[in-house]
Design a protein with these regions (language model features):
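Active-site-proximal beta-strand elements of phosphoester/diester hydrolases
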Residues: 2-12, 91-100, 129-133, 185-189, ...
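Core catalytic region of metal-dependent phosphoesterases/phosphodiesterases
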Residues: 4, 8-89
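Active-site neighborhood of phospho(di)ester-bond hydrolases with catalytic His/Asp-centered motifs
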Residues: 7-10, 33-38, 59-65, 82-83, ...
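Active-site environment of divalent metal-dependent phosphoester hydrolases
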Residues: 12-17, 40-46, 65-72, 88, ...
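Conserved catalytic scaffold of divalent metal-dependent phosphoesterases
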Residues: 13-16, 66-153
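Active-site charged/polar residues at nucleotide-handling catalytic sites that mediate phosphoryl
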Residues: 28, 125, 161
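Conserved beta-sheet core of the metallophosphoesterase superfamily
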Residues: 60, 142-203
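Conserved hydrophobic/aromatic beta-strand scaffold that supports enzyme active sites
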Residues: 86, 96, 131, 177, ...
Length: 214
């Protein structure tokens, strides 16, 4: 079996999430965490390191659009950063990208679609685990406006490369699990809203939505 992982996104500086996540890890026998960004809420960047250390587990992470640029340094000091890079985890390539495409909110870590494409292209491999903050356009990317706001660059790269699993957050309102054209997708929901997920990789992929206890 490749591994079992707690998946968290959109903590937005809620300190209580770390304790609740530890309890969930104990309950499900999990020892590693995937963080999908927006660990802070427009800072302070140091919170990312403090939060990751409070989890007490090995972490793989990308920053979110609400994480100021300096946050990446603190992620790199306390977790395995997947922002614009890839690593091999239990024999499978994992890679990712943080931040998001442009939004109406003009948050600190947004980038144009062209930059997303350039940054993510070297990371992509068929059959990989893709760890993102921003979702692909058309998949778990619909806020209350009911308009798709995900990245077209991410969507196009997924279609071209066919990863095994795509994990993303960012859109708090569009939580779920789906399989489309052979690719598994999960948005675990916002941890600040007491939501989480679990990824199990082995002979089969199993993605499960979980709830955090306050």
């Amino acid at each position: 079996m490749e591994g079992r992982y707690l998946v968290l996104s959109d903590v937005h500086c809620r300190e209580w999430v770390a304790e609740s996540a530890r309890a969930l890890m104990d309950q499900h026998g999990l020892h590693e965490v995937v963080l999908l960004g927006d660990i802070t809420h427009f800072g302070p960047p140091q919170f990312a390191e403090d939060f990751i250390k409070a989890l007490g587990a090995k972490c793989y992470a990308v920053p979110g659009n609400c994480d100021p640029p300096g946050t990446l340094t603190f992620i790199e000091s306390s977790a395995i950063s997947l922002h614009g890079r890839k690593v091999v985890v239990n024999g499978r390539t994992w890679g990712g990208l943080g931040g998001s495409n442009p939004s109406i909110f003009r948050t600190p870590s947004e980038m144009p679609e062209e930059e997303i494409f350039r940054s993510l292209s070297p990371v992509m491999e068929r059959g990989m685990v893709l760890v993102l903050h921003c979702p692909a356009h058309g998949t778990f990317d619909t806020p209350f406006s009911n308009k798709h706001v995900g990245s077209t660059a991410v969507r196009d790269l997924i279609r071209r490369t066919e990863p095994l699993v795509v994990l993303s957050g960012h859109i708090h309102e569009d939580r779920g699990v789906a399989q489309k054209e052979g690719v598994w997708y999960m948005n675990p929901g916002a941890a600040k809203d007491r939501y989480a997920g679990m990824m199990e990789l082995g002979e089969e992929v199993k993605l499960t939505l979980l709830d955090l206890e306050v």
